[in-house]
Each structure stands twice: as structure tokens, then as C-alpha cells.
Curated annotation (Swiss-Prot):
One of its GO terms (biological process) is purine nucleoside catabolic process. GO terms for cellular component: cytosol. The keyword Transport does not apply. Phosphate binds at G21, R25, R44, R88, V89, G90, T91. Keywords: Glycosyltransferase, Transferase. CDD domains: PNP_EcPNPI-like (cd09006). It comes from Shewanella baltica (strain OS155 / ATCC BAA-1091). Homohexamer; trimer of homodimers. This is Purine nucleoside phosphorylase DeoD-type. It holds the Pfam family PNP_UDP_1. SUPFAM superfamilies: Purine and uridine phosphorylases (SSF53167). InterPro entries: DeoD-type, Nucleoside_phosphorylase_CS, Nucleoside_phosphorylase_d, Nucleoside_phosphorylase_sf. A purine D-ribonucleoside binds at H5, E180, M181, E182, S204, D205.
Length: 236
């Protein structure tokens, strides 16, 4: 039952999926944290895998960069393959001076400069919010592990290289915690098709201060976030 962008067979994906942007990061997650792993799709080298974590079937697949790519894959995964829980795992740039590099942010809501959710909501503003049950599961997992998480609004940008850096001042004033490029689109797709979605990201760099994590720090923080998210996933 291949779609234009996924060549997996029916039933290849678990109901719960971790959804990083980078397909090689998806491969890393599958090979590092899952057992009984099988690669199930590779169209355009957007790799997808299914395996088990502590006995529960879990999938992981890349989404690509930006809302359009993420929305295509999310739509086909939910609509055509029956994926019910999509958890974006990735990195972001911090905006608020209260947020530090290596912090973990849970995107309770996703602001955006994209028009994609207005297009699907008849021209009106749609509140792109995470699913409460998924969010609560990850928060509880963080508590068990002693991991501090920040919960609040993030911003899903259409442009990586913004021509208007003054927008960051507005974001900070409005309490936006960090900037990434996918969550608002993912949340919109999930609401449209009756699925559940969440975005969990680590802060890899601080847009205001210029501070950045080293490659080693990024990997350690990312690994901790993945374990925290997988522990939440097995409770769903």
C-alpha cells in the first residue's frame, strides 16, 4: 500500500512513532535504542524503521526539514498507515533568556509565520497545540528520570535564515521558548486527521546569546531526551 512518499507495506508502522527531522537520526535512534529493528521505508532516502522498546512496538522515521515536508509524511503516516501518536524529537534555538542550552522544551503550543494552518482552517487562526495525554506522559517520564523540562510555546519558522531578526524581540516578549521548523504543521495535521502529536526538542544553540553546544554535548542531551520520550511512549 505504498504512498507517493512511503513504500512501507500495510501494518509496517507501530501506532506510536518518534519523528526526527533527519533520516540518519531516525536510523541512529532505531539502531541505538530499539530491538528487533526492521527498515520499512526508504523513498527519497527518508528512512523509516520499526522495532521494540522494552517489548512495545515503536516506529521511528525522518520528517525532513520544514512544515511542508513534515506535513506530507505526517499526513501519509496517519491517513494511510494508521499511526496514532507522532512525537517530533529534535533540536531548537532558544529565544528566552530564561532558557539555557541543553534544556529540554516541550512544545505545548506552536506559533508560526506559515499560512498552512489557515489554509486548512478556512482562513482563520488555528491554535496549534500538542495533545495533552502525550504531553503529560513525557512530563511524567521526565519527573521519574529527574530531567527538568520547560513547557510552553515554541515558534515554527518557515525561514531558517530570517531577514527580520527583530522578530526575536517580539517572540521573547510573548514568552516563546524556542524556534524550530516543524511543530505547527505537525500539530495541524494531527488535528485534521484525529491523531495525537507532540514536539520535544533540546536547545542546541541560543539565538540571543550566541552560545552553542558542542557535538558531544548535543549527542548526550539528545540521547537523554530520546530515552525520556521512549519511556513515555511505552505507557501510551
Amino acid at each position: 500500500m505504498a504512498t507517493p512518499h512511503i513504500n512501507a507495506v500495510e501494518g509496517a508502522f507501530a501506532e506510536t512513532m518518534l519523528f526526527p527531522g533527519d533520516p540518519l537520526r531516525a536510523k541512529y535512534i532505531a539502531e541505538t535504542f530499539l530491538e528487533n529493528v526492521e527498515q520499512v521505508t526508504d523513498v527519497r532516502n527518508m528512512l523509516g524503521f520499526t522495532g521494540t522498546y522494552k517489548g512495545k512496538r515503536i516506529s521511528v522515521m525522518g520528517s525532513g526539514m520544514g512544515i511542508p515536508s513534515c506535513s506530507i509524511y505526517a499526513t501519509e503516516l496517519i491517513r494511510d498507515y494508521g499511526v496514532k501518536n507522532l512525537i517530533r524529537v529534535g533540536t531548537c534555538g532558544a529565544i528566552s533568556t530564561d532558557v539555557k542550552v541543553r534544556d529540554v522544551i516541550i512544545g505545548m503550543g506552536a506559533c508560526t509565520d506559515s499560512a498552512v494552518n489557515r489554509l486548512r482552517f478556512k482562513g482563520q487562526d488555528f491554535a496549534a497545540i500538542a495533545n495533552y495525554e502525550l504531553m503529560n506522559a513525557v512530563i511524567e517520564s521526565a519527573k521519574v528520570r529527574g530531567t527538568k523540562v520547560r513547557v510552553g510555546n515554541i515558534f515554527s519558522a518557515d525561514l531558517f535564515y530570517t531577514p527580520d531578526p527583530q522578530m526575536f524581540d517580539v517572540m521573547e516578549k510573548m514568552g516563546v521558548l524556542g524556534v524550530e521548523m516543524e511543530a505547527a504543521g505537525l500539530y495541524g495535521v494531527a488535528h485534521e486527521f484525529g491523531a495525537r502529536a507532540l514536539c520535544v526538542v533540546t536547545v542546541s544553540d541560543h539565538i540571543r546569546t550566541g552560545e552553542k553546544t558542542s557535538a558531544e554535548e548535543r549527542q548526550t542531551t539528545f540521547n537523554d531526551m530520546i530515552i525520556m520520550t521512549l519511556e513515555a511512549a511505552i505507557t501510551l
